From Swiss-Prot:
PANTHER family: TRNA N6-ADENOSINE THREONYLCARBAMOYLTRANSFERASE, TRNA N6-ADENOSINE THREONYLCARBAMOYLTRANSFERASE, MITOCHONDRIAL. GO terms for molecular function: iron ion binding; N(6)-L-threonylcarbamoyladenine synthase activity. NCBIfam families: gcp_kae1, T6A_TsaD_YgjD. Gene3D superfamilies: 3.30.420.40. Fe cation binds at residues 111, 115, 305. This is tRNA N6-adenosine threonylcarbamoyltransferase. Substrate binds at residues 134-138, 167, 180, 277. One of its GO terms (biological process) is tRNA threonylcarbamoyladenosine modification. GO terms for cellular component: cytoplasm.
Length: 342
């Protein structure tokens, strides 16, 4: 079985082909960073229009990369939600149209289930059950994963997601777009001793997160530094970036440790765009070593949005006989706990 996967939930157009026997045989990705850079964030209308321009050429490129023709594809998976409604509609419409034309089944895939199962594409995939930390620009969640489709939400952010807090703090520091990754690189030059940021909601029980207060703390620290220095020096920016990043990483690690203790599990999966963060990976790897457990994460190219994870999840569900009706439908808001177990 060969599945074509299409990802258009936000500002990346991803197309991939997953083969049941060979694994991932094609992966194409176009990022819209340059398109949105002047605006300092994703403009939904521009994102949708760019998906319209890029999706079909990427499908052709993926088929060519795999050495396949349309007749060789057995099913199509597309991101149905959550995400930007216009962007989702582009991928959904193209996927449904191709499925109808090629007389094959199509299935709408949950974007975050794609991220959660992305580590399954690696040579050493995690075994069930495990705790998953899904951390991106739109989500920060801790999930108990018993099997594919058997998900229990343990905790989530009650306001800003971790990735969103990274981007907003980077903007306050005057860093280039996309700010989160720029802030992380800058933090490597920071002085660990100069600033200390709070670890929000770690002084109380529970597994929920809150990062909006951390962003406010960063803004106040920046304003104070400007009063003292006149304008922020590059070193001060790096010092603030370090303190902010360390606060986020420590907070995520503390909550992960609690979730592992609560479930009794020894396996931790980290996925989503922020899972590419080097400091987060190192911190959680050190923690799991102390706990005599295992940590898993996708390779960097599969941390951000991509078609490979959608193709893989689509394969799992289509193989079990699950498919979506012909009507074009998207779910901008969609809880992962609503998914069927397979």
């Amino acid at each position: 079985m060969r599945i074509l996967g299409i990802e258009t939930s936000c500002d990346e157009t991803g197309v991939a082909i997953y083969d049941e026997e060979k694994g991932l045989i094609a992966n194409q990705l176009y990022t819209q960073i340059a398109l949105h850079a002047d605006y300092g964030g994703v403009v939904p209308e521009l994102a949708s229009r760019d998906h319209i321009r890029k999706t079909a050429p990427l499908i052709q490129a993926a088929l060519q990369q795999a050495g396949l023709e349309a007749k060789d594809i057995d099913g199509i998976a597309y991101t149905c939600g959550p995400g930007l409604v216009g962007a989702l509609l582009v991928g959904s419409t193209i996927a449904r149209s191709l499925a109808y034309a090629w007389n094959i089944k199509a299935i709408g895939v949950h974007h975050m289930e794609g991220h959660l199962l992305a580590p399954m594409l690696e040579n050493n995939p995690p075994k069930f059950p495990f705790v998953a930390l899904l951390v991106s620009g739109g989500h920060t969640q801790l999930v108990r994963v018993n099997a594919v489709g058997q998900y229990e939400l343990l905790g989530e952010s009650i306001d800003d997601a971790a990735g969103e807090a990274f981007d907003k703090t980077a903007k306050l520091l005057g860093l280039d777009y996309p700010g989160g990754s720029v802030l992380s690189r800058l933090a490597e030059q920071g002085n660990p001793e100069r600033f200390f940021f709070p670890r929000p909601m770690t002084d109380r029980p529970g597994l929920d997160f809150s990062f909006s207060g951390l962003k406010t703390f960063a803004a106040n620290t920046i304003n104070q530094a400007i009063k003292q220095e006149g304008e922020l020096t590059e070193q001060t920016k790096a010092d603030i970036a370090y303190a902010f990043q360390q606060a986020v990483v420590d907070t995520l690690a503390i909550k992960c440790r609690r979730a592992l203790k609560e479930t009794g599990f020894k396996r931790l999966v980290i996925a989503g765009g922020v899972s590419a963060n080097k400091q987060l990976r190192q911190s959680l790897a050190d923690m799991m070593k102390q706990l005599k457990g295992e940590v898993f994460y996708p390779q960097p190219q599969f941390c951000t949005d991509n078609g490979a994870m959608i193709a893989y999840v689509g394969f799992l569900r289509l193989k079990q006989g699950e498919y979506s009706p012909l009507e074009i439908d998207v779910k901008p808001r969609w809880a992962m706990t609503e998914l069927k177990a397979i």
